Swiss-Prot record:
Annotated Gene Ontology cellular component terms: cytoplasm
Transmembrane segments: none
Protein source organism: Rattus norvegicus (Rat)
Protein name (Swiss-Prot/TrEMBL): F-box/WD repeat-containing protein 2
Modified residues (N6-acetyllysine): 298
Length: 454
């Protein structure tokens, strides 16, 4: 049939076909299919898929495709990536979807990075790490051996761990290698804090001392307490050292001169923790940038002015129970915005701007958890048998790690958390290094470390 004649015939057939009922149209199609050969059937098969199975990701504008993808969970999205190259390309290009998926896992997000494929890879890495935490496979352990008597003082900073012992020595360890960097002769150590040049120690001999790492020389000796010194902190910027003691007193010292500037009284129990920290919020009594002095005993947390006024008064006292029926656990967290402490009733979080209790986090499945570290996303907790990670958004325990029979001091000085940045959200790089350290009955130090990504 000539082309012109064919087009005329086709037009006539089309007019007639459109006048048929649906049933007649179906019968006509069935008859035509029965008359078709292999070439016609293959043509029909190829075109039916396009007509009947519309690929919305391929046909819709990219903005609408991204909007639809935001309603799917990440695991479904990963499955959809396997449908076709086109689907994989579109889904892997949706930055917001993968950033949100990472945020929901508690990972820190840099919004300036808009590379969708980067965030998809971060998500895949994140779910692997979260699976390891869930399956108790995210950590590994190690030991530091070198002391010959009990170790009751630990302090960690930037990959270095300081240990103070009753063997009259303090050692500085490189956690990554397990090697002792410095070892100096001291007095008995109940508390330690260090920087690159110096070590400050609080002792059971009722004094505080400052030592030089490089020479081991004692550069300053602070005398005045009448009980063991359980906690120390200092600021080079202020040239101030603070100490808390079993004599119920907090003392403020001139760091370089060694003279006592003030004695703060008001505690009726051992002062087990002192913290010198800059305020990050405008509070009722402080402005951002002001230095804050906190002290804690087994019942109360006190906030003090930093000055030289004699008989200066405590600015604020925080407690869990007015009748002292509930004790505070020894570890105290203060980051300039929030004060957090654990008790038998759970974790208490105070807003430093108002001193109000923001929330009480209870863990009914595990009682009497002690606080090690607290962040925006995670908290690190422990008891006599396990180390726990809590997701603070859901207040649920998402991981635990077994601990050996360690030496747990009532003051909280013989155990500590390591790197803390991951508590504000993992980012694929900060889940390295030390997680937890504690002294052992055999005088060694037990370390829990992040296992490298597999």
């Amino acid at each position: 049939m000539e082309r012109k004649d064919f087009e005329t015939w086709l037009d006539n057939i089309s007019v007639t076909f459109l006048s048929l009922t649906d049933l007649q149209k179906n019968e006509t199609l069935d008859h035509l299919i029965s008359l078709s050969g292999a070439v016609q059937l293959r043509h029909l098969s190829n075109n039916l898929e396009t007509l009947l199975k519309r690929d919305f990701l391929k046909l819709l504008p990219l903005e609408l495709s991204f909007y639809l993808l935001k309603w799917l969970d990440p695991q479904t999205l990963l499955t959809c990536c396997l449908v076709s190259k086109q689907w994989n390309k579109v889904i892997s290009a949706c930055t917001e979807v993968w950033q949100t998926a990472c945020k929901n896992l508690g990972w820190q997000i840099d919004d300036s990075v808009q590379d969708a494929l980067h965030w998809k890879k971060v998500y895949l890495k994140a779910i692997l790490r979260m699976k390891q935490l869930e399956d108790h496979e995210a950590f590994e352990t190690s030991s530091l051996i070198g002391h010959s008597a009990r170790v009751y003082a630990l302090y960690y900073k930037d990959g270095l761990l300081c240990t103070g012992s009753d063997d009259l020595s303090a050692k500085l360890w490189d956690v990554s290698t397990g090697q002792c960097v410095y070892g100096i002769q001291t007095h008995t150590c109940a508390a330690v804090k260090f920087d690159e040049q110096k070590l400050v120690t609080g002792s059971f001999d009722n004094t505080v001392a400052c030592w030089e790492w490089s020479s081991g020389a004692r550069t300053q000796h602070f005398r005045g307490h009448t009980g063991a010194v359980f906690s120390v902190d200092y600021s080079d910027e202020l040239d101030i050292l603070v100490s808390g003691s079993a004599d119920f007193a907090v003392k403020v010292w001139a760091l370089s001169a060694g003279t006592c500037l003030n004695t703060l009284t008001g505690h009726t129990e051992w002062v087990t923790k002192v913290v010198l920290q800059q305020c990050k919020v405008k509070s009722l009594l402080h402005s951002p940038g002001d230095y804050i002095l906190l002290s804690a005993d087994k019942y109360e947390i006190k906030i003090w002015p930093i000055g030289r006024e004699i008989n200066c008064k405590c600015l604020k006292t925080l407690s869990v129970s007015e009748d002292r029926s509930i004790c505070l656990q020894p570890r105290l967290h203060f980051d300039g915005k929030y004060i957090v402490c654990s008790s038998a009733l759970g974790l208490y979080q105070w807003d430093f701007a108002s001193y109000d209790i923001l929330r009480v986090i209870k863990t009914p499945e595990v009682a009497n958890l002690a606080l090690l570290g607290f962040g925006d996303v995670f908290a690190l907790l422990f008891d006599n048998h396990y180390l726990y990670i809590m997701d603070l958004r859901t207040e649920s325990l998402i991981s635990r790690w077994p601990l050996p029979e360690y030496r747990k001091s009532k003051r909280g000085s013989s155990f500590l958390a390591g790197e803390a940045s991951w508590l504000n959200g993992l980012d694929g790089h900060n889940d390295t290094g030390l997680v937890f350290a504690t002294s052992m009955p055999d005088h060694s130090i037990h370390l829990v470390l992040w296992k490298e990504h597999g």
